[in-house]
Amino acid sequence: WERIYVTGKGTGSTAYPQMTLSTIVGSGTYYRLGLPAPASLPSTPVLSNKDSSATIPTGAATPSLLIDQESPKSISYVVTYVSTYGEEGPPSQPLLANIVDVYSDQNVTVTFPANPSGYGNIAKKRLYRTDTSGTYRRVKDSNYSAATVLDDLTESELQEALPSSSWEAPPDEVTSGDYGHKDGPMLGLVAMPNGILAGFSGQTICFSEAFLPHAWPRDYQLTAKSDIVALAPMTSGLLVLT
C-alpha cells in the first residue's frame, strides 16, 4: 500500500493515530487514522415518480400509480465515508425517520448529513439501503461535496452488502461520542504477522481487521489488569508489557 501508520506523533489536539504515504513520510500530510461514522440522515427521504410525466391523483398519499396494485417496500438508508485511498468507515446510525415506504414506480432522494471537520482525506459518500431480507446493500457513491443523492435502482441492481458496520476508528481522545476513549489516543502501534495491527490505550489492547489498518472493531478489544506500556509482536501472538 506504500503507507505509513504511526501513533504517539503530535501533542494535544493532534495526538491522534495518523497515516501518510511512505513516499512523502517526514514532509507530507498526515491524516487521522480511521474514518468517522456520519451523523444520522437529517430528514425523511423524499419520494418521486420514475415517470416525470405521470399524472398523480389529487390528494394521493404518495406519488405512485401503483397504490392499489402492490404493497410498498419499507426501506432504510445509511451512509458511510470513503477515503482517498478507498478505506471505508462505519455507517451512520439508522433512524425510524429514515425509513420510507417505496412503490416500484418511485425514486427516492436522500439528503446527506453535514460533513465532519478534521478529516481531510474523505473523498466519497457511499449510500446503502435495505433489501427484502433487511441487509444493507450498496446503492451508489457520491462526491464528498454532494448534498443529496437519487436512488433510482431496483433491488436486483443493488451491489455488495455493507462490510463496515463494526469498523470504528482507533481510540482517539480528540474525537467525541463513540470514538472517544477515557485513556486517550491509541499508542504503541505494532504490526503482527497475520496482517493485523495492534495498539493500546490505558489497559485496553486494540486490534485492527486483518489488512485493514483503518478498521478497529470494538469487539476485538481486550483488557489487561494493569496499564500497558508496550507491545511486541511474536510469531505465535502478541506480548503485552505492563
Put a short name on every predicted segment:
Residues W1-G195, S201-Q203, F207, P213-D219:
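Disordered, low-complexity "stalk" and linker segments at domain junctions of extracellular
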Residues E2-R3, G195-I196, K225-T242:
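Beta-sheet-dominated scaffold domains
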Residues P72, G120, V190, A224, ...:
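Active-site-proximal structural scaffolding
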Residues G184, P217-R218, A224-S226, P233:
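Intrinsically disordered, low-complexity segments enriched in polar/charged residues with Gly/Pro
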